[in-house]
Amino acid sequence: MKFSERIIEWQNLHGRNNLPWQTNDPYKVWVSEIMLQQTQVSTVIPFYENFMQSFPDVLTLSKANLDEVLKNWAGLGFYRRARNLHQTAKIITDKYHQVFPDNYEDLVALPGIGESTAGAILALAFNKKGTILDGNVKRVVSRYLNVENNPRELKKSIKPFLYQNSPKTNYRSFGQGMMDLGSLICCLLYTSDAADEE
């Protein structure tokens, strides 16, 4: 069984399949990916649900006052994310007529959307090949390749590995599976030094 097939099978059996942003709506995937930067899933869920109540689509977000967006973001921190979200919503509304671009180049040109977020939108919303490079995915790959203690080797190896081991279809399940495996099973290891610092 191929690496990608194992990840997809694991995802279908054990992964998180009921998160509120698990949809093919790129707006919802995008908002969740921005919120999840530096923030745990359990923390994001109530903020995401409240944000969607106030801004259910990209047009509503683009027309909102920035102060209103920041008020709805309060408690998540990293307010630059909210400002970029608002600015990008305006661009998607004006330039793309409220339709999210479904290609890497156009996505990474938008404020606040980097390589990993673009990969997540492509894979999770459009079911297209997209490379998700969040901490969970990096941890899975680093342990699989046995380069966990060699960040330089991981940086050199991760993209070729993911490219070569991505499935031919079902990018959504593969991407979600890699993130879930890293979050639920292949977790961060805490050393006694780290515990002493807390």
Tell where the protein language model's regions lie, with residue ranges.
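Single conserved hydrophobic/aromatic residue that forms the stacking wall/gate
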Residues: 190-198
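Catalytic cores of DNA base-excision repair glycosylases
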Residues: 3-189
